[in-house]
Regions:
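Short beta-strand-loop/turn "lid" adjacent to the catalytic site in phosphate-handling enzymes
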Residues: 52-105, 142-148, 153-154, 182-193, ...
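Short, well-ordered alpha-helices that flank and scaffold nucleotide-derived cofactor binding pockets
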Residues: 18, 45, 75, 79, ...
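Glycine-rich phosphate-binding loop signature in dinucleotide/nucleotide-binding domains
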Residues: 50-55, 120-122, 210-213
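Glycine-rich phosphate-binding loop plus the immediately following alpha-helix
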Residues: 31-38, 106-108, 113-122, 146-192
Length: 241
């Protein structure tokens, strides 16, 4: 088995794979970094929960967009499993060619999204990751990663709006019964969800126009199941990219 670690701006995803089969996935916060010992304790608790031990894993892989957490977690993982984890970077053979400017600056989360999707979906391909940021990644029919788009995530935009206004009510993001909100809370949540859904539809159209052909579209991330059902475009939701 292989232990995979996805260190994002909000959460750390910890998954166990047997070949291409995901056996389990757990998430912990990345906003409150732990010590080396703290992460080892978390890893031990997660494996115990699933009836596993460190000896069951032949290796590990880390994808991270939070450098300050990467070093500590990498050290904890090496001590826990007895071997260094493989760090996902643009220098690895990921099954596609990176054709962007400054490949070394492309987020590992974006590289991982494409690598996960390319083995499951036909090309050309657009991946959309709805997390702290919403990222679009475009792969053409020749397995070339051309680039993409980045915009504020749903939760990030929601917090920014509430943080900059004095009288807007706080609340969870969910789709109200009607597009035209009957109160301020419905106006905010409907605007957030439908606004993002329409933005996604529009950006997909622009990308496909520039590509000159239709593309398979795959969405993942914490807000995918909340936003994507309100899109008009056919989009596959895959939470295990």
């Amino acid at each position: 088995m292989v232990l995979t670690i996805d260190i994002g701006n909000t959460t750390i995803g910890i998954g166990g794979f047997q070949g291409n089969k995901l056996l389990f996935i757990e998430k912990i916060s990345s906003r409150r970094p732990l010590s080396d010992a703290g992460y080892r304790k978390k890893l031990n608790m997660i494996l115990n929960k699933h009836g596993l031990s460190a000896e069951a894993f032949e290796g590990s892989v880390i994808s991270s967009v939070v450098p300050s957490v990467t070093a500590v977690f990498s050290s904890a993982l090496e001590a826990f499993l007895g071997q260094k984890p493989l760090l996902l970077t643009h220098e690895l053979d990921l099954g596609y060619e990176i054709c962007t400017e400054f490949p070394e600056k492309v987020g590992c989360d974006r590289l991982a999204d494409i690598a996960g999707a390319i083995s499951r979906y036909p090309l050309p391909l657009i991946t959309i990751d709805l997390g702290t940021a919403t990222t679009f990644n475009v792969l053409d029919e020749n397995r070339r990663f051309l680039g993409g788009l980045i915009l504020p995530g749903v939760g990030t935009a929601h917090r920014a709006l509430l943080g900059k206004t004095a009288q807007l009510p706080k609340g969870d993001i969910h789709m109200p019964a009607h597009t035209i909100g009957a109160n301020t809370q419905e106006c905010i949540t409907g605007g957030m969800l439908l606004g993002n859904a329409c933005a996604i539809d529009g950006l997909i159209r622009h990308i496909q126009t520039e590509l000159g052909q239709k593309a398979t579209v795959v969405a993942t991330g914490g807000y995918a199941t909340t936003v994507i059902p309100h899109c008009e475009t056919k989009i596959h939701i895959d939470q295990n990219l």
